[in-house]
């Protein structure tokens, strides 16, 4: 498929107890953490479906593990094309996604995770505009990683470093410098990984947040999980 302007690729995992949001356990059970992730994913996909319409992007949902594609496709908005992630680790899977999108003709590629609920349409617009001059755009998270990546072309080696550490941003920036990329770093956001992140989410509660993640907030309210965060 040819891409006229660009592509948004959402990276997602199957919401399996014991394999997602494990840093929330305790105080939550693995089942509660998995359901919270499922709600986050639902909210992020619904919001992203609106964003890609406004920004004229193609929407791709890259799923891990590959055998979960059918399950996730049944609950994903119809705007998304669901594909399996390919690669032995997250960095290789991200590199694969960028290569595939660019091979299809994408001039700009955005990658986002499925646990950063405050990435809204304006953040994505800012990233796309930054790619007019920058080769790489990153939106940092509070834990040393990032929740949004923008690229104009594949860059070998960019993500070839450990991805589950507090130095992910620094490592990616170092690889970008070696490759001679022009980099733009956006204002930081945060992702939901720990009880402290949930407490921050409650502090930031607002009409904007309610629009971005209604199912997540409803689950936290219904189960009174705020009290254990």
Question: Model-derived features: where do they sit?
Answer:
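Conserved donor-nucleotide/metal-binding helix-loop-beta segment in metal-dependent transferases, i.e.
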Residues: 118-143
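N-terminal nucleotide-binding beta1-loop-alpha1 segment
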Residues: 1-23
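Short beta-strand/loop segment that forms part of the nucleotide-sugar
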Residues: 57-65
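Short aromatic-hydrophobic micro-motifs that form the base-stacking/packing surface
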Residues: 110-112
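A short, N-terminal amphipathic alpha-helix
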Residues: 37-55
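Short, glycine-/small-residue-rich phosphate/pyrophosphate-handling segment
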Residues: 156-175
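Short phosphate-binding loop-to-helix
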Residues: 71-108, 165-168
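Conserved alpha/beta core of the MobA/IspD/sugar-nucleotide pyrophosphorylase nucleotidyltransferase superfamily
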Residues: 171-229
């Amino acid at each position: 498929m040819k891409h006229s302007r660009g592509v948004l690729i959402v990276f997602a995992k199957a919401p399996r107890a014991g394999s997602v949001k494990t840093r929330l356990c305790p105080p939550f059970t693995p089942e509660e953490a998995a359901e919270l992730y499922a709600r986050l994913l639902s909210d992020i996909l619904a919001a992203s479906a609106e964003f890609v319409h406004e920004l004229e992007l193609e929407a791709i949902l890259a799923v891990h593990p590959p055998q979960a594609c059918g399950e996730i496709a049944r609950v994903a908005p119809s705007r998304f094309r669901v594909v399996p992630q390919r690669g032995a680790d997250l960095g290789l899977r991200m590199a694969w996604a960028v290569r595939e999108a660019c091979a299809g003709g994408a001039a700009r590629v955005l990658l986002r995770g499925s646990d950063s609920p405050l990435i809204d349409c304006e953040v994505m617009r800012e990233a796309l505009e930054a790619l007019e001059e920058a080769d790489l755009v990153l939106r940092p998270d509070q834990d040393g990683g990032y929740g949004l990546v923008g690229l104009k072309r594949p860059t070998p080696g960019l993500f070839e470093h450990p991805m589950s550490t507090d130095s992910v941003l620094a490592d990616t920036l170092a690889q970008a410098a070696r490759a001679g990329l022009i980099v733009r770093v956006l204002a930081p956001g945060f992702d939901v990984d720990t009880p402290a992140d949930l407490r921050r989410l409650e502090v930031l509660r607002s009409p904007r947040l309610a629009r971005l993640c209604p199912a997540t907030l409803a689950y936290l309210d219904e189960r009174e999980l705020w009290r254990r965060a």
